[in-house]
Amino acid sequence: MPYFTTKDACKIFYTTYGVETSNPVVIFLNGTTQTTLYWGGLVPAFSKHFGLLCYDARAQGQSDLGDIPISLKLHVADLKDLLEYLAIDKAHLVGMSHGAWVALAFSAEFPEMVDHLVLCSLSAKTNDRSRAIVRSWLEILRLSGLEAMAWAALPTVFGNSFLNQHRKILDKIVDAVVLRNGRRSLIAQLEAVLRYPPPGNMTKNLNQPALVISGVDDPIIDPSDVRRLADLCNARHAELAGIGHSIPAEAPRIVEKLVLEFLSGSSEY
C-alpha cells in the first residue's frame, strides 16, 4: 500500500488512478470518519476523464495520527508536501465537509496549485448547533466509544431519505465506521475541528472557479451560511432536495453529473 512520510515522520496513506503528466488530476478530500473508500462510487466515471488522487488525511483511516497537534494549517502543509512528492503541480480539489474545509484553506494559501474547487457540505461559519453536534460526538466518543458515537452521528450525517432506504444496513454502516477509525485519532480530529477558523475567513484570495453543493436535509450547516460561502467564493451553488450532509454517499450520480459538468465546462463532459 502506498504511503507518503511527512517531515515529522507521519505516514499518510494515498491511492492514485491514472495520475500522469498528461492527465488533469482530481483530488478527493475525505470528511470526518471517512476514508479513501468513501469515493469508490465516483472513481469509475471520474477516472475516464481525470487522474485521481484519494488520500486519508492525518488521523484518518490508514494514515497516522502523528505527534504534532492537528490543525487546519497542518493538513494544508501535508497536502502540499504530498503533491510535491507525487509531482502534481496543479489539480482540481473536491472536498466533502472536513475535506472541503481543507480544500478551501489549501486553495487560499496555494491558489496557483488549484484549478477548480468543489466544496460539499461546507458553510461560511460554524453556528452554535453545528459546534454542539461536533462537541456531542466528541463527548460520546470519550465516554462510550466509537460504536456509540457512530450511531449518534447517523441522523446528523445522513438525510431522512437515505436513512429510510438503507435502514436494514445501518448496523453495517456503523460497523464500517468503527473498523476504519481509531478512537484516539478521531478524538484528535474532533478537538481540532472545534478550533478551525471559519471557512468564510479564507475566501479573500480565491480566484478559482468554484462550485458549492449542499443538501436541503442537512442539520449540520445553515442554508443561509452556505449561500454566504457561495457568494464569498463567487461560486455556483447547487442545493439538493432530500439530501443530507453526506452528499457524495447519498447522491453519487447527481454529484458525478454536477462535478464532471463543472470541471469540463460542458453539459456532456
Predicted segments, located by residue:
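Flexible "cap/lid" loop of the alpha/beta hydrolase fold
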Residues: 104, 108-109, 114-144
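Conserved alpha/beta-hydrolase catalytic His-Asp/Glu region
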Residues: 128-132, 147-204
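Short beta-strand/loop motif that positions the catalytic acidic residue
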Residues: 206, 212-214, 218
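Conserved alpha/beta-hydrolase "acid-adjacent" motif
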Residues: 219-225
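Catalytic histidine-centered segment of alpha/beta-hydrolase-like enzymes
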Residues: 243-256
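Gly/Ala-rich beta-loop-alpha elbow adjacent to hydrolase catalytic centers
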Residues: 95, 99, 103
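Conserved HGGG/HGGXW glycine-rich cap/lid loop of the alpha/beta-hydrolase fold
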Residues: 8-68
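Active-site loop/oxyanion-hole signature of alpha/beta-hydrolase fold enzymes
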Residues: 41-44, 53-96, 257
